[in-house]
């Protein structure tokens, strides 16, 4: 079951990290954010992650798609709130 609390928590965390990621000029900082979000994706409500990812197993974990994934996740969560 996807709770309002899990949506709000995911949105707050991902939104904050996205803003830092977008404005960062430091590769190591971006890499750290990708690693943190990848770890978070392993702990997020499984139903919420499935809804966001459309079942894609590498969602929020693929370096090449990371910025698109996190931007998508924040937009979807924002629309739900």
Model region roles, listed by residue range:
Residues 3-14, 33, 37-49:
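Short amphipathic alpha-helical heptad-repeat segments
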Residues 19-31, 45, 56-63:
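Charged, low-complexity interaction regions
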């Amino acid at each position: 079951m996807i709770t309002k609390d899990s949506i709000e928590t995911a949105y707050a965390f991902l939104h904050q990290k996205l803003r830092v990621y977008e404005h960062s000029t430091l590769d190591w900082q971006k890499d750290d954010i990708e690693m943190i979000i990848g770890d978070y994706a392993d702990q997020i409500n499984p139903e919420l992650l499935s809804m966001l990812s459309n079942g894609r197993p590498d969602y929020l974990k693929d370096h090449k798609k990371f910025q698109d994934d996190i931007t998508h996740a924040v937009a979807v969560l924002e629309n739900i709130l």
